[in-house]
Regions:
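Protruding loop/beta-arch "assembly-hinge" segments enriched in small, turn-prone residues
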Residues: 116-145
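Short, low-complexity, charged/polar segments at coil/turn and helix-coil boundaries
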Residues: 11, 15-107, 145
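Short histidine-centered catalytic/ligand-binding loop motif
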Residues: 17-24, 108-126
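Short, intrinsically disordered N-terminal pre-domain segments
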Residues: 1-15
Length: 145
């Protein structure tokens, strides 16, 4: 029976922790990316994102500093630098994004009357978060051995 010295046991644990940290970061980044893709998936491809001109869909951005603004970056560029423990904020900068997500009933500032049901593209993606993380974990586990 082989015996591990204290040094080799410590090195084994060190390598295991390093791999676990790499996996955790990869799962975090991959899950956030998948969440964004799910929320932005067009209705024509089975998602809930309505697409007419593509402006709403293309206004999807992310930030590590707070809710995104028009100056924020695309999600993949934010995820490159994000670390475990940081928060990633995502959203759409199109002025009508909130109405498309939640719907709108009533008159707007110009007196136009609406009775529009919400599409729930972000909420439905957020509800799938546990499944998205599990999918990411399986994918990352096969990549980082």
């Amino acid at each position: 029976m082989a015996r591990l010295s204290n040094q080799s046991a410590a090195r084994f644990v060190e390598l295991w922790v390093e791999k676990a940290n790499k996996r955790a970061l990869a799962i975090f980044r991959d899950s956030a990316q998948r969440l964004g893709e799910e929320a932005n998936k067009p209705e024509a491809r089975g998602g809930k994102m309505p697409v007419d001109t593509g402006f709403l869909r293309n206004s999807f951005v992310a930030s590590k500093d707070g809710m995104p603004t028009k100056q924020s970056l695309p999600l993949p560029l934010v995820l490159i630098s994000v670390q475990l423990g940081e928060t990633v904020y995502v959203g759409w900068t199109a002025k009508y994004a909130r109405r498309m997500e939640f719907g709108f009933e009533g008159a707007d500032k110009l007196g136009r009357t609406y009775s529009q049901a919400g599409k729930g593209f972000m909420r439905s993606a957020a509800q799938r978060w546990p499944q998205i993380v599990n999918e990411s974990a399986r994918a990352v586990k096969s990549r980082i051995r």
